[in-house]
Amino acid sequence: MAAGGNGAGGDTRAAFARIYKTLKEELLTDPAFEFTEESRQWIDRMVDYNVLGGKCNRGLSVVDSYKLLKGADALGEEETFLACTLGWCIEWLQAFFLVLDDIMDDSHTRRGQPCWFRVPQVGLIAANDGIILRNHISRILRRHFKGKPYYADLLDLFNEVEFKTASGQLLDLITTHEGEKDLTKYNITVHGRIVQYKTAYYSFYLPVACALLLSGENLDNYGDVENILVEMGTYFQVQDDYLDCYGDPEFIGKIGTDIEDYKCSWLVVQALERADESQKRILFENYGKKDPACVAKVKNLYKELDLEAVFQEYENESYKKLIADIEAQPSIAVQKVLKSFLHKIYKRQK
């Protein structure tokens, strides 16, 4: 989850960074595998390259949310460690998804550097590295949470979110399948389903669900909160689709390729809804082609249809609805958690 504004304080960030080193060292000395020096160095470099480098907003959100739920300005040492550890599990999950997503999307850059599979000597070893990253999560959870009453709920939560995210990725991939390009399949319902499952659950619901479990809560009692966070995640992904086309690549850390990749983007769905027959013909002839001239024609059509203004209206209406839904929640602490998420992403530029 990209965010600006008021994130975690310096003390929280320092603790978060310190705990990363502890978790990584545990993984590098895991007695379940006899590492050679070469394999240990590979894992060390691979984890740093892929888990670090982002803004860590998903992970830090666990700590911030836990504090708000407890009504505490500061957490005890063990509470901080456990919250940060769950936060890092989400960052590891994000790394796992991104390593594999970049291979499937044939991407070039991620977080301002080459995608891991494009690093010399890595290539498709990155696919196995992704599997290792996912397995690290299970090992971290077992080491630090096995004795907790909510351990089984944590495992279920991560497994459920991973399944939903992978299913969303599948829907995204088969909808944009090479050789079967058919823009008539693209509509707001298909787009909504993809982003709900591909992004919203792991980016928005998972951090808050982790904080709720740490607080001793039963997730079955928070269906409304799940729905609000999924809506927020949808809004976030629409922002992402918008920034893919209109954001500054140097500022957002990646070069947008949704048009070239034939993505079921919010922008193309909006264009299809608004275009006349001649404009639709331009989309059908140019969308999903690598040729810069074709990309330019699509972007020019977006400008003709004034999709920037359409997005601004969508953003404002989404914000109003989310605020109303949040303020309908009976728990003030839960309201604070949800508002903290919303304020981090509202009007973001990266």
UniProtKB/Swiss-Prot annotation:
Catalytically driven reaction(s): isopentenyl diphosphate + dimethylallyl diphosphate = (2E)-geranyl diphosphate + diphosphate; isopentenyl diphosphate + (2E)-geranyl diphosphate = (2E,6E)-farnesyl diphosphate + diphosphate
Gene Ontology biological-process annotations: cholesterol biosynthetic process; farnesyl diphosphate biosynthetic process; geranyl diphosphate biosynthetic process
Keyword terms: Cholesterol biosynthesis, Cholesterol metabolism, Cytoplasm, Isoprene biosynthesis, Lipid biosynthesis, Lipid metabolism, Magnesium, Metal-binding, Steroid biosynthesis, Steroid metabolism, Sterol biosynthesis, Sterol metabolism, Transferase
Gene Ontology MF, one: metal ion binding
Keyword Metal-binding: yes
Major site of localization recorded for this protein: cytoplasm
Binding site for dimethylallyl diphosphate: 110, 198-199, 237, 254, 263
Binding sites annotated in the UniProt record for Mg(2+) 1: 101, 105
EC number: 2.5.1.10, 2.5.1.1
Positions contributing to Mg(2+) 2 binding: 101, 105
PROSITE patterns, alphabetized: POLYPRENYL_SYNTHASE_1, POLYPRENYL_SYNTHASE_2
Record's signal peptide: none
Protein name, UniProt field: Farnesyl pyrophosphate synthase
Gene this protein is translated from: FPS
